[in-house]
Amino acid sequence: MKTYLETFDNGPGGWFGWIDNARGPKPLERGESTVISRSPWWIDYNHAPPGAGYMHLLFMLLTSGYPGENQREVSGENQFTKGGFGTDFTNAELTLRLKGELRSLDTQLYLLIQGVHKGVCTGWILTGQPINVTTEWSEQRITAGTDESQWTCLGSRHDRSDFYGRTPLKTVLSDVNANILLVLYPLDIAPMGPLNGDPHVLRPEKDYPVWRSRLPEGYVMLDEVRIEKS
């Protein structure tokens, strides 16, 4: 069994946040041997209906490839890819040590895995195993099993099906070659005022304002990530 362990003692270790589609990655806040994600978070609309919906991207880690200069400056040296931990996450056990203050509303924190196969990027959220965020440190353990009933496939918004789609869970789990993320899902997107068009065709906070009071706010501190693979 090979184990990945990130304690953030020497920096973000490859973990980062996200600004938006146009501007890409951003550094996470740093605490004492921790990384911190704090609201307001961007509304990820890439999977708007007919996809699975909207989410906030709190923490991200690339699982393969060679990051460029900007990515390295944002996220530090990626200890996952440097350590050669591989992209097969089938039945991997993830243990997270975290805490925070979160006005989560009807969302929960979940693991999201993404892989690109035959030109299609597929995301699966482990919605059957929510990750609890409490005000005191706790360890949360989840298992990336192959039972599709535990997962939700993200699919694609109406105009991104050239890139996003659906590949079987077992295929993606066996080669999570894009990234893993911790996300808040699902978001309640409420347009502020009348719209001239379909809210799912238009892009929230880019094409129209939304009621931020309907969205999560707060912060999450991540102290340790352990991934055990068989």
Regions found by a protein language model. Give the residues of each.
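Beta-rich carbohydrate-recognition modules and glycan-binding surfaces
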Residues: 1-230
